[in-house]
């Protein structure tokens, strides 16, 4: 069956708009990366910073090195130089409409007791970073998610206790990536959970009818 000309035109328009949005997003993320790099250079933190543009957005890694730690060892207490960097970054992140995800990572050094472990530490450090960004003026609703990864995603897997594994990652999401995440968690509770409940109810009714 032939596709109506009007339908084809609408499809082309949608594709063109999508392409323009992707191009605009890539340009904005590139400019954001340049701004972040300038701030890190001025703070003499180039060695602590890595960035890459991925399909989901701009991935910003701020990590420890052998000379400086972002937090006191074994603690979520933030060090002054890292706090200064985050304060400088807050208005930069706020300059775009993009949502962000903040994730904490640790090395593989284990705690001596089970009361507090690397899961707690990585989560508390991510929350500390979020708090500094918000205190510096970044709106609370800019943060879409705060995550703890403990030592599950080591950058240097050959050296699990390496300083470079201790890091904070800030993902600046594209619009499509944040939309996907909203759908994944069922925004407003009616996009994922309710349809599934309705489907199960229908299956139960059909099962009863066939008995």
Curated annotation (Swiss-Prot):
<comment type="similarity">
    <text>Belongs to the MotB family.</text>
</comment>
<dbReference type="InterPro" id="IPR050330">
    <property type="entry name" value="Bact_OuterMem_StrucFunc"/>
</dbReference>
<protein>
    <recommendedName>
        <fullName>Putative truncated flagellar export/assembly protein LafU</fullName>
    </recommendedName>
</protein>
<feature type="domain" description="OmpA-like">
    <location>
        <begin position="58"/>
        <end position="176"/>
    </location>
</feature>
<dbReference type="InterPro" id="IPR036737">
    <property type="entry name" value="OmpA-like_sf"/>
</dbReference>
<dbReference type="Pfam" id="PF00691">
    <property type="entry name" value="OmpA"/>
</dbReference>
<dbReference type="GO" id="GO:0071973">
    <property type="term" value="P:bacterial-type flagellum-dependent cell motility"/>
</dbReference>
<dbReference type="GO" id="GO:0120101">
    <property type="term" value="C:bacterial-type flagellum stator complex"/>
</dbReference>
<dbReference type="InterPro" id="IPR006665">
    <property type="entry name" value="OmpA-like"/>
</dbReference>
């Amino acid at each position: 069956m032939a596709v109506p000309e009007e339908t084809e035109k609408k499809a082309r328009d949608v594709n063109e708009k999508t392409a323009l949005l992707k191009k605009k997003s890539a340009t904005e993320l590139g400019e954001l990366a340049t701004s972040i790099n300038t701030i890190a250079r001025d703070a003499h933190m180039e060695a602590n910073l890595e960035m890459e543009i991925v399909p989901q957005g701009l991935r910003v890694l701020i990590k420890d090195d052998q000379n400086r730690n972002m937090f006191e060892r074994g603690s979520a207490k933030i060090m002054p130089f890292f706090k200064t960097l985050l304060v400088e970054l807050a208005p930069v992140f706020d300059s775009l409409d993009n949502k962000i995800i903040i994730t904490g990572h640790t090395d593989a050094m284990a705690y001596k007791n089970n009361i507090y472990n690397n899961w707690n530490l990585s989560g508390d450090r991510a929350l500390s970073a979020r708090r500094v960004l918000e205190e510096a003026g970044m709106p609370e609703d800019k943060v879409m998610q705060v995550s703890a990864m403990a030592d599950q995603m080591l950058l240097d897997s050959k050296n699990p206790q390496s300083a470079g594994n201790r890091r904070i990652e800030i993902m600046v999401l594209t619009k499509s990536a944040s939309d996907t995440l909203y759908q994944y968690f069922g925004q407003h509770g009616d996009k994922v959970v309710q349809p599934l409940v309705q489907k199960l109810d229908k299956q139960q009714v059909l099962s009863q009818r066939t008995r």
